[in-house]
Design a protein with these regions (language model features):
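Secretory targeting and sorting signals
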Residues: 1-7, 11-46
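Acidic Gly/Asp/Thr-rich repetitive segments characteristic of extracellular carbohydrate-active
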Residues: 80-106
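Extracellular beta-strand-rich solenoid/capping regions of secreted or surface-exposed proteins
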Residues: 96, 116-133, 143-164, 170-188, ...
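The right-handed parallel beta-helix/beta-solenoid scaffold, focusing on the short coil/turn
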Residues: 104, 112, 130-132, 138-140, ...
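Extracellular beta-strand/beta-solenoid scaffold signature
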Residues: 120-123, 147-155, 175-182, 201-209, ...
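Right-handed parallel beta-helix
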Residues: 159-254, 261, 265
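Leucine-rich solenoid repeat scaffolds
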Residues: 395-445
Length: 445
């Protein structure tokens, strides 16, 4: 089993490739000669941008849905803040000055790609150390130039609080954590209506590596790759994912999301089409998790626990979750609950059409699992098509139907554990092939 990746050293503690004074000079005197270019709308002078005060009233985030004298609401007006022309040098200068002045809101140009060609302390942009908001517009992108040396796009350090609105972050590549964004301990990241795509990390967190606090709102994290864990998101801190899509990412463990040692909350959205050696979708490793109203579908893994895995003293609650069409080459196509002090509660949910080559097509349980008002339908494995149990499973008002085992235990195969059907609550185990249950008291074979 893969062990959680340790947080990397704060990039500010590493040997600096460029002295910090140079970037202060850049931010205050105008950015020239840094081999950074952009494509898009013609740029204004970076010096003009750098010279503005980024902490005036106009630069602060809006706090309410007020209307101006013309009667227009917030959604009809440009967000308050300092405009940054379509020029990577100008963006670097603006962030540098924002850090110096205690934070700012920066409005990036629409239909613009800010093209970064040289790293600053392992990232294409200056480390975020204060509250900074980057507002994108239509088709605003920040990317690393394809021919440039490897670096991630953004690092959020202690005291930094970065908000991304309507932005695409792409092309980051690092031999450490966080292909696109690294959030260090004491840092915070919020993405709203943004896309993190096609980034690569040689270790953990192909899209985002979170060691602080990260919130992903109405955003997409897709097509990122990590050689270790967390193809989309690797988190050792607090992680909230709301109405977002973590899809088509690749990792050795936790293709979509890997959470270790803290808490992950996923609400709505999807974790779909991810690939991994172990657990294509969501891997909760020595952590706590709550998933509500999310589709966890079409994930694949060559190991165990493809849709969701709960392991290494972890707890997970899933409500109104659709875990369907996931495929494992070993066990636990839909849900895998590891041996020992691991606990899963599944309520008002569906585990359907999941497949495991060997055992536990729908659920593989070696810990403790509780199913309430849940359907385990149409899953398939060699043994234990619906559920394979080595631990304790309690079912309440749950249906285990139309599952298939090639050998035995079409519905439930109990292998030395405890299965409590609680049939008085309405639990039924029927229409499974070649049989409904093996070693399950109160279940007709």
């Amino acid at each position: 089993m893969n062990r959680p990746h340790k947080p990397t050293t704060d990039p500010t503690g590493k040997t600096q490739t460029r002295s910090r004074w140079r970037w202060w000079a850049v931010g205050l005197a105008g950015v020239t000669g840094l081999a950074l270019t952009t494509v898009g709308t013609p740029a204004a002078s970076a010096a003009n941008t750098a010279g503005r005060n980024l902490t005036t009233v106009d630069d602060q985030p809006s706090t309410g849905n007020h209307r101006d004298k013309s009667g227009k609401g917030e959604k009809e007006r440009k967000p308050p803040g300092t405009p940054v022309p379509c020029d990577a040098d100008a963006l670097i200068a603006a962030i540098t000055l924002a850090n110096a002045r205690g934070g700012a809101t920066l409005n990036l140009a629409s239909k613009c790609t800010y093209l970064l060609t040289a790293p600053i302390d392992d990232a294409g942009l200056p480390d975020i150390t204060t509250p900074i908001t980057l507002n994108g517009d239509k088709h605003t992108t920040i990317t690393r130039a394809a021919a440039a040396q490897q670096f991630r796009i953004l690092t959020v350090n202690t005291g930094g609080d970065l908000t991304l609105n309507h932005l695409t972050i792409t092309g980051g590549q690092t031999d450490n954590d966080g292909g696109a964004i690294l959030v260090n301990t004491g840092g915070a990241l919020t993405t709203n209506h943004s896309t993190i795509t096609r980034n690569i990390a040689a270790t953990a967190g192909g899209g985002i590596a979170n060691n602080g606090t990260t919130t992903v709102n109405h955003s997409t994290v897709s097509r990122n790759t990590a050689s270790d864990s967390g193809g989309g998101i690797h988190s050792l801190g607090l992680l909230n994912v709301r109405e977002s899509h973590v899809d088509a990412n690749i990792a050795n463990a936790g293709g979509g999301i890997f959470e270790s040692g803290s808490t992950v909350t996923v609400t709505g959205g999807s974790i779909s089409g991810n690939q991994a050696g172990t657990t294509g979708g969501l891997f909760v490793f020595g952590a706590n998790g709550v998933v509500t109203g999310t589709k966890i579908t079409r994930n694949t893994s060559s190991g165990s626990g493809t849709g969701v895995r709960v392991d290494n003293t972890a707890q997970l609650t899933m409500r109104h979750v659709n875990v369907s069409d996931n495929t494992s080459d070993i066990s636990g196509g839909g849900l895998f609950v590891g041996e020992g002090d691991n606990f899963a509660v599944v309520e008002d949910s569906l585990l359907k059409n999941n497949t495991a080559t060997f055992t536990g097509g729908g659920i593989f349980n070696s810990g403790e699992t509780v199913l309430r008002r849940t359907k385990v339908v149409g899953n398939q494995a060699d043994v234990g098509g619906g559920i394979q149990n080595f631990g304790t499973v309690n079912l309440f008002t749950t249906k285990v139907t139309k599952n298939i085992a090639i050998t035995t235990g079409g519905g439930i195969l109990n292998s030395g554990g405890t299965v409590n059907l609680n049939t008085a609550t309405g639990t039924v185990v029927i229409k499974n092939r070649p049989n409904n249950c093996v070693n399950v008291p109160g279940c007709a074979g």
